[in-house]
Amino acid sequence: MSNDIYKMRNLVEISSMVAESSDFFMIKDKIIEKMLEVVHPTKACVNLFYKNNYKHAYLVCSQTLEKIPYLFPIGGTVGVKIDFSTYPKYIHEAVKEKKIVYVKNVFEDIRAIDEREMAKSEGYVGRIVFPLIVNNIVVGFMTCFLVEEDTISDYDIDFISSVASLIALSIEITTKNNNMQRLVHKLRGAISSINEATKKLYHNKNINEFLDHLSEQACDITNS
């Protein structure tokens, strides 16, 4: 089987993972593993921004950390928090301009001057950044690391870009699912509270207190 067919097969498998899961954090490492089966950067990692806050990025991929994936409850942040200002300029460029940036040699590109010590320590030479975009907003980025022996073609970059789009879709699905679960939780709480208020209305006959309580519940559900 040719490498191109392997790529298409793995892309279909990644698409199926995304379609069948409502939790990106449960499948993120499997996605990266499938991607690296058919393209050969040394490793890849995913960083996320939470609530459109670009002051910090959260490293969430155990492929890079070589640790068990972190799983947090709804509403919690996932991953290792890193000051985004410490990232190389070309990563800021990729995020700001919403474009793929390929630095073939970090020791020759002035934009990578601040990461050269890390590159020596980790043993990589090149790096490619793929922004993760949801509804025209960058919600994170994936980076691929290359050593001197690694080769990567334009077709490989297109393939990784397709995977990045599927990762972004998975993040969007997860966000919508979490928002729905939060709303269900609020509705359940509101129903319980309204039932209690109804009992008080029956006993106290105080309609104003009851209406005030309904207003409070409506504000809580709508975040107003």
Predicted features and spans:
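Heptad-repeat alpha-helical coiled-coil signal-transmission segments
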Residues: M1, M8, I167, I173, ...
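Short regulatory/linker helices and ligand/cofactor-binding micro-motifs at input modules
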Residues: M8-M26, K30, K34, I191-E209, ...
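Allosteric cytosolic regulatory segments
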Residues: I157, S161-E172
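A short, aliphatic-rich beta-strand micro-motif
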Residues: V125-I133
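GAF sensory/regulatory domain recognition
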Residues: E33-L36, C45-I82, E216-C219
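Short beta-strand-to-loop transition segments that serve as allosteric relay/switch motifs
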Residues: G140-T151
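Regulatory sensory and allosteric helical modules in signal-transduction proteins
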Residues: K67-I110, D114
